[in-house]
Amino acid sequence: MSSTRILTALLLLSASLAPACKAQLGKNVMIPAGSDADHQLNAINAADPSQKLALIDTFAKSNPDPDFQIVADEQYVNYYLNAKQYEKAFEYGEKLFALDPNNYVNAVNMVRAAAEKGDHTKLFTYGEKANSILANYKAAPPPEGTNPDDWSRIRTEKLVSLRDDEDYVEEALIGGAYNAKDPAKRADYLVRFSKMYPNTPESEQALAVAATAYLQAQNRPKMLEVANGVLAKDPDNIDVLLLLADDYSERGEQLDKADTYAKKAVSLADTLKKPDNISDEEWQKKITIQKGWALSSEGQVSLQKKQSAQAVDSLSKASTLLRSNAGLYARNQYRLGFAYLNLKKTAEATKAFTEAASVDSPYRAMAEDKLSELGTAAKTPAHKKPS
């Protein structure tokens, strides 16, 4: 994390002040080199952690000027952050913002405190604050009397110097969003993340996950809003195509659209490029499940349309592909059982329901009920995980 903005320089005959630091945003507090304040800060920086707080207290009391209080609050924030006393860090961070609203380093430190504490509310509040400070700086006109070309160069250099902090904030935000346990909050955080980083691959992926989280939170209107928004920008987003195909086919709504989305997902699964950060084995497993999921949705569309033979064909193809995912596999076999029943193929239906009941999933009990109705409950094998 970036250091506190303590500006010092050689003591000149005219008692000159230290130059501004290019790597910071916010007020540049000038500390006269060789002054009492300079000596106090040097002592703070050199002190053992057990002695720092008393020295910071002394500095704050002996330098009441608002600019020096900025430096004091920065020292308090760093001390409490390193001591993992996060509430105290937040307290002094807010005091610092009151004196220096555009202090980017303070915003980054608050993000760090919130991330380490696991406080997602504060994490996004301060993350948005950090991004707002950067955005305002990028949009700011040249200061009065500054040549526009010089200003462009200075601004570029400063933004480059802040890149590591900017990357840290982004990573902290996306990590916090994905780790939020409540699906409704997770979805909201991911949408907020996307708004902060629009037109990026991370933004698109965040929205795709947000759509799924909204569905988990039983907020279907928001799921549809977010998912359709993703497809409007990226019609080939396989995750969203699968989500909508599954939702529509399961509910018996917009079946033609569901079928189109499912078929497109099957085609995309064969052409997707493997990301660099995933192994060949993991990638193969992922696309195998995606293709099986899409075929299962195709089969469900056919079931809804009373096209049982087509349903059997799609669901049978999906069966092999979904074996590594208990929930999807069990649901697919449950659907396949009904497709066979519609064709009056009781033996095949019994086999499909038996397979659905053989794995630990929400479909186990329903499959067992169907087997009981068919008079074959005694033949149900011991429950097991799919191979």
Cite the ranges covered by each PLM segment.
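N-terminal leader/linker segments that initiate helical-solenoid repeat arrays
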Residues: 17-75, 83-84, 125, 137, ...
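Terminal, low-structured helical/coil segments at or just beyond the last alpha-helical repeat
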Residues: 27-32, 165-171, 188, 275-277, ...
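"A position-specific structural signal for the A-helix of alpha-solenoid helical repeats
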Residues: 38, 75, 109, 171-175, ...
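Structural motif corresponding to the intra-repeat A-B loop/turn of tetratricopeptide repeats
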Residues: 46, 83, 117, 180, ...
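Short solvent-exposed coil/turn linkers within tandem alpha-helical repeat scaffolds
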Residues: 62-69, 98-105, 135-146, 160-164, ...
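Residue-level recognition of tetratricopeptide repeat
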Residues: 78, 112, 178, 212, ...
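TPR/TPR-like (Sel1-like) alpha-helical repeat modules
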Residues: 112-139, 249, 259-270, 316, ...
